[in-house]
Amino acid sequence: MIPINISPATVVLCGSIVTVSIAYVIFVVGHRRKGFPPGPPTLPVIGNIHQLPTTGAHFKFTEWAQKYGGIYSLKLGTGTALVITDREIVKKLMDKKSSITSDRPPSYVSYDLITKGDHLLVMHYNETWRKIRKYMHQFFRESECEKKHITLQDAEATQMMLEFLETPDNHNLHTKRFSNSIISTLLFGLRTPTYDSPHAKHLYDIMERWSAVMEPGNTPPVDIYPIFKYIPESLFGNWISRASGVGRDMERLYANMISQFKIRAEDPKISRTHESFFDILLREQEKTREFTDHEIAFIGGVQLEGGSDTSASILTAFVQAMVNWPEVQRVAQEEIDRVIGEDRSPTWNDFAALPYINAIMKETHRWRPVTPLSFPHCLTKDEYLDGFLLPKGATIILNVWGIQNDESVYPRPEEFDPSRFKDHKLLAPEYAVSDWKLRDHYSFGVGRRICPGIHLAERNVWLGVAKLLWAFKFEKATGADGQPIEMNVDPKTGYTEGFLHCALPFKCKVTVRSEERRKTILKEFELAKQVFNEYTG
């Protein structure tokens, strides 16, 4: 063996490096830097990781906001998260500074394992993201919704009335079919005539699994401590296999829907009056080849997901609210009956004449947001806000639940009270760009990441609310003893866990308001079937 001569100076130097490194880890990693927004006390190395709940993080974040303010910081190992629970700060940072707050933080689970980075929700703020958004904006902008898409939306809402009439016990499935059929038809010319349609059932299964995987605590903090990639996943609930499985099923479903669309597009027996999104996108793709096949599949997938879940979950929460607050239901039906008779159901042309319906829609978004914590943003440069240093690379979490349950803005926030929005006569897109004091809710996101389907979604929900209230009375179901069955509307126990929140299945009594309205529903559904043929061929 060749002897190694190490000088005393080298030994001292190496020892000093080790000592300094250990001291750095102990006294710096996990600690909040001076000038950062305040937050809960930290521990060396891990920061606040040990304090993060595995479920219902938005409740804890709201509790901390009451103590530490509208913006506070959490230390996650070497990283920093900023939690915003203040509407004015949202406007200052997320809207007015959107050029530096529109990126996404690293996510090994959602970016690498599940979507390979091609899903618009997790995609970084780059040129590909801008190209995809441009296509979506052009197809779903307000003028297109007004001129073209609203006809289909009205027809699908009419079928939903028929479904509530015929099988009221399946009301939670009818709202899902309704919203999925609209977006699937507009994207692919493929309707969802029943909830049992394979593409719809498969999609909702995937979304439920993805939501569960993305719940904080369901996977190890691999973005903070990459060593978790190399520890046997069986110690953490096979998290890699679960996430990868969701990604494979996503890709398989979305690619198959593109393939089936191409087959139908080449079938001479199918003649559609209205072009779908993919008629336009694939025609452009033939010229430019600007997207990969995987990107194309996920361009469809992200819109299917967004268009299928939010509207359905909001309509389900609306039904809950009508059962539990019958006075709200009574006031809404009185407004409808003053404007519309029994010989027709409400249409989008009635929007201005039914402001209370708009208020109900806004209050439902506020009362039970589908995403109580919006998908995280990432700060791309240092920024100063109200005297605080917000560091480059920080993860930004918008605490939608906390903002929309702020008692200083919404007294008795657990009460469903549409009168909060009696002066809000416009739709959500108008308030998203207005003064922060007028913002109605944050269901569609903020800044440059605001949902590109916002105009479609607003019309989905408004039509659903208006037609269902015109047609039906919603009451508590009764048990075998003849007593009303109380509904669990507790956001902690009556709703699903995960990134997306929806009411757990519940029973209620749905009764058509008159025989004349029943006949009108049947008559309007016959007309709706003609509309479906125009979109599907």
Swiss-Prot record:
Pathway field: Secondary metabolite biosynthesis; terpenoid biosynthesis
InterPro entries in the cross-refs: Cyt_P450, Cyt_P450_CS, Cyt_P450_E_grp-I, Cyt_P450_sf, Cytochrome_P450_fung
GO MF annotations, alphabetized: heme binding; iron ion binding; monooxygenase activity; oxidoreductase activity, acting on paired donors, with incorporation or reduction of molecular oxygen
SUPFAM superfamilies: Cytochrome P450
Induction info: Expression is down-regulated by the cluster-specific transcription factor AOL_s00215g275. Expression is also down-regulated by the HOG1-MAPK pathway downstream transcription factor MSN2.
Domain of life: Eukaryota
Membrane topology annotation: Single-pass membrane protein
Glycosylated residues in this chain: 126
Pfam families, A to Z: p450 (PF00067)
Cofactor(s) named in the record: heme
EC number: 1.-.-.-
GO BP terms: terpenoid biosynthetic process
Keywords attached to this entry: Glycoprotein, Heme, Iron, Membrane, Metal-binding, Monooxygenase, Oxidoreductase, Transmembrane, Transmembrane helix
CDD domains per the UniProt record, alphabetical: CYP64-like
Binding-site list for heme: 451
Subcellular location: Membrane
Knockout or disruption consequences: Abolishes the production of arthrobotrisins A to D and arthrosporol A, and accumulates m-cresol. Lead to altered growth rates and causes significant decreases in the spore formation and germination. Shows significantly increased ammonia levels in fungal mycelia.
Transmembrane segments: 9-29
GO CC aspect terms: membrane
Role, per record: Cytochrome P450 monooxygenase; part of the gene cluster that mediates the biosynthesis of sesquiterpenyl epoxy-cyclohexenoids (SECs) such as anthrobotrisins and arthrosporols, metabolites that possess a novel hybrid carbon skeleton consisting of a polyketide-derived epoxycyclohexenol combined with a terpenoid-derived monocyclic sesquiterpenol substructure (PKS-PTS hybrid). The SEC pathway plays an important role for fungal soil colonization via decreasing fungal nematode-capturing ability.
Family classification: Belongs to the cytochrome P450 family.
Protein name as catalogued: Cytochrome P450 monooxygenase AOL_s00215g282
Organism, scientific name: Arthrobotrys oligospora (strain ATCC 24927 / CBS 115.81 / DSM 1491)
